[in-house]
From Swiss-Prot:
Homotetramer. Its main location: cytoplasm. This is Cystathionine gamma-synthase. One of its GO terms (molecular function) is cystathionine gamma-lyase activity. It comes from Escherichia coli (strain K12).
Length: 386
């Protein structure tokens, strides 16, 4: 029987404990495991290489994304770095979105400057620019859809097909939607990665990442390198992640519903100069999103019509929205891209990506939607007092 996403998320790892019959899998905190005899190791020998708790959550994540296997890492950034370590060598080209997450941009840019590989940042929604970049014969193509922070949507299937034509490996960062709303492997990607810190865990108490591959041989190679460079995830984080994963689908449904109400509210506000959400017909890639996603997601961003003082007054008027980086938790967060999530990008790079100095990003939580809108109303009231 093919299981639905909600069932996979809830049931993963349940009733697997044969020793005591625990319904919920236990946390295996041991760093090392004894051998049964000389040259007779067990399934696990050292927790950096393998851990029973990590095994359970890796199987769950692989099943949710439809992959052959998954490798859990200690951060989302280490998941990205793991992929580039495996697939790129000095001289190889990486093609990445020009408006990608600021941490990814900083990593690629800094390692390219050290000669680890070459990187080309391109607007992947511009087919001419994308084809020109692919003509340079990249080894790896990273796709981020929807993008961070402008929620631009690109055609994953098309980009992965074009990448395959030039012999490139395609990897999709699916952090913004989670497997509950989008499955890149089914759209043709070779790999999918997540910052598990975000929606997969959903409670802002874990830092972790994951890479999931279609090919079991690639999973084996990723796991070997993750152990080799020491970026595998820990047992306690694995346990918390598995616990959070069980409520992924209902959390996404409620957060998405709140986001849609907030988008509708923001459309009525004179201080909102631009609004970005895939549900909006004017949003770049709206029609693609309607086709390749199972929902429009709970992330949105908007530009305030004003200056830094307007921003300060607006943010100061909020009490429910927490001013913080990250996203995907049950609580609603708001962040200022230029000084927070994308501070690692040079001002000219932010400008080229369309990230303005008054852009705010919202990660919608699962609080009461009317309370969230009332809080935004307080923010706009404060902003207008200047």
């Amino acid at each position: 029987m093919t299981r639905k996403q909600a069932t996979i998320a809830v049931r993963s790892g349940l009733n697997d404990d044969e020793q005591y019959g625990c319904v919920v899998p236990p946390i295996h905190l041991s760093s090392t495991y004894n051998f049964t005899g000389f040259n007779e190791p067990r399934a696990h020998d050292y927790s950096r290489r393998g851990n029973p708790t990590r095994d359970v959550v890796q199987r769950a994540l692989a099943e949710l994304e439809g992959g052959a296997g998954a490798v859990l890492t200690n951060t989302g950034m280490s998941a990205i770095h793991l992929v580039t370590t495996v697939f790129l060598k000095p001289g190889d080209l990486l093609v990445a979105p020009h408006d990608c997450y600021g941490g990814s941009y900083r990593l690629f840019d800094s390692l390219a400057k050290r000669g680890c590989y070459r990187v080309l940042f391109v607007d992947q929604g511009d087919e001419q620019a994308l084809r020109a970049a692919l003509a340079e014969k990249p080894k790896l193509v990273l796709v981020e859809s929807p993008s961070n922070p402008l929620l631009r949507v690109v055609d994953i299937a098309k980009i992965c097909h074009l990448a395959r034509e030039v012999g490139a490996v395609s990897v999709v960062d699916n952090t913004f939607l989670s497997p509950a709303l989008q499955n890149p492997l089914a759209l043709g990607a070779d790999l999918v990665l997540h910052s598990c810190t975000k929606y997969l865990n959903g409670h802002s108490d874990v830092v972790a990442g994951v890479v999931i591959a279609k090919d079991p041989d690639v999973v084996t190679e990723l796991a070997w390198w993750a152990n080799n460079i020491g970026v595998t995830g820990g047992a306690f984080d694995s346990y918390l992640l598995l616990r959070g994963l069980r409520t992924l689908v209902p959390r996404m449904e409620l957060a998405q519903r709140n986001a849609q109400a907030i988008v509708k509210y923001l459309q009525t506000q004179p201080l909102v100069k631009k609004l970005y959400h895939p549900s909006l017909p004017e949003n770049q890639g709206h029609e693609i999103a309607a086709r390749q996603q199972k929902g429009f997601g709970a992330m949105l961003s908007f530009e305030l019509d004003g200056d830094e003082q307007t921003l300060r007054r607006f943010l100061g008027g909020l009490s429910l929205f927490t001013l913080a980086e990250s996203l995907g938790g049950v609580e609603s967060l708001i962040s200022h891209a230029a000084t927070m999530t994308h501070a690692g990008m040079a001002p000219e790079a932010r400008a080229a990506a369309g990230i303005s100095e008054t852009l705010l990003r919202i990660s919608t939580g699962i609080e009461d939607g009317e309370d969230l809108i009332a809080d935004l109303e307080n923010g706009f009231r404060a902003a207008n007092k200047g």
